[in-house]
Amino acid sequence: MKDPRDIIKRPIITENTMNLTAQKKYTFEVDVKANKTEVKEAVEKIFGVKVEKVNIMNYKGKFKRVGRYSGYTNRRRKAIVTLTPDSKDIELFEV
């Protein structure tokens, strides 16, 4: 099994994701090869909370050009983690 800190890259903190924290939903950028089970176990191990479900979205890389050079940006994977109602909040997202 992979190290949990390799699976969870960083939290995604935007206005929309901060509104979701009221519903106990937290958003993270995760490794593109990680599946829902690995994300669930990593969040439970790192933050000490109970996860109810995990939703995952994939983003393909955007096409970019710089002068005569062209290529794609890195693809990304975003996970929205829903905690159980009796679980404590993740302090990382506190204002």
UniProtKB/Swiss-Prot annotation:
Q: Where are the membrane-spanning stretches?
A: none
Gene3D superfamilies given in the database record: 3.30.70.330
GO cellular component labels: ribonucleoprotein complex; ribosome
Q: Which UniProt keywords apply?
A: Ribonucleoprotein, Ribosomal protein, RNA-binding, rRNA-binding
UniProt-listed InterPro entries: Nucleotide-bd_a/b_plait_sf, Ribosomal_uL23-like, Ribosomal_uL23/eL15/eS24_sf, Ribosomal_uL23_CS
GO BP field: translation
Please give the Gene Ontology molecular function terms for this protein.
rRNA binding; structural constituent of ribosome
Per the record, the domain of life is Bacteria
Q: Name one Pfam family in it.
A: Ribosomal_L23
| Coiled-coil ranges (or none) | none
Function of the protein: One of the early assembly proteins it binds 23S rRNA. One of the proteins that surrounds the polypeptide exit tunnel on the outside of the ribosome. Forms the main docking site for trigger factor binding to the ribosome.
Q: Which HAMAP family match?
A: Ribosomal_uL23_B
Family assignment?
Answer: Belongs to the universal ribosomal protein uL23 family.
What does the subunit comment say?
Answer: Part of the 50S ribosomal subunit. Contacts protein L29, and trigger factor when it is bound to the ribosome.
How is this protein named in the record? Large ribosomal subunit protein uL23
Q: Provide the species name.
A: Geobacillus sp. (strain WCH70)
